[in-house]
Amino acid sequence: MGHSEEMIQKAIAQENGKVHVNAQSIPEKYQQKRADEAGVIEHIRYPSKDYFLAGKEITKEANVYLPYGYSRDKKYNVLYLMHGIGGDEAEWGMVDEDSLVKRMMDNLIYYKEIEPFIVVTPNGRSTENCAREGSDYNSFYVFGKELRSDLIPYMEAHYSTYAVEGDPSASRMHRAMAGLSMGGMQTINIGIGECMDLFSYFGAFSAAPTSNLAEKTAKILEDTPYTVDYFYNICGTEDEIAYDSAAAAAKNLPALCDKLKESDNFIWQELKGMHDFHIWYLGFFNFAQIAFKSVSYTHLRAHETGRNL
């Protein structure tokens, strides 16, 4: 669907490059591994189908961050965090105690910047062969079926969330979707494009070139009865892969859609940077502080709660 092999390989190479996160972007105290009050990462396997091919029953894998003190006696918001075209459920690093996503979450919670919530990193390819290499990239585009029919129901059956039985839309304000590159495309095309009844918070980090154009997203938002609590975007100005597409997908949305208002429930953040984790970790750090704020901190305006915006 519009991918050139050269662009794909370039995106994969940049995704897999080693990154030293700049402490000026994400304060050092949020990057530290906590010796106390630390959450845990669980690895899950859940039943699904090969939605790209013949609908064969398969098993998919994902990683789940549970905040410190997680209890079945409490209810938690859930962020579904998507990877890029060269990654899988492990690309965000949520595989062990050294995960930067985990460290940021642990510290944001410890310093009371956010209320505790769950983070899920699934494999965004909805097909049996969902490996980093050798899989069909078009399987990214049917992930919405797996998300709706398999992953969200599994999470809500096995973890303590705000799920309302028989009515997923009743708890949409307790779910968020975000992702890097191809995962940013999935957030726009699938999260907003197909699943507004399931989510109300969205984050696109360097959204991929096949993301819906702003005009299409604006029409979707105008036609849906659901509102957007927040749509956060970030992209590097030196990103040769995604800057033009990400800007075309989101930058002018408030001018096209009455449901999005700059600094109220929408932000476009661009800064010097390329198509890599310098941008994406900062995107996660910022979005983690924006998501669920109207739920957890109703007395604060969303634009007052972000960092480095």
Per-range role (PLM):
Residues 1-301:
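Non-catalytic cap/lid and distal C-terminal segments of serine-dependent acyl enzymes
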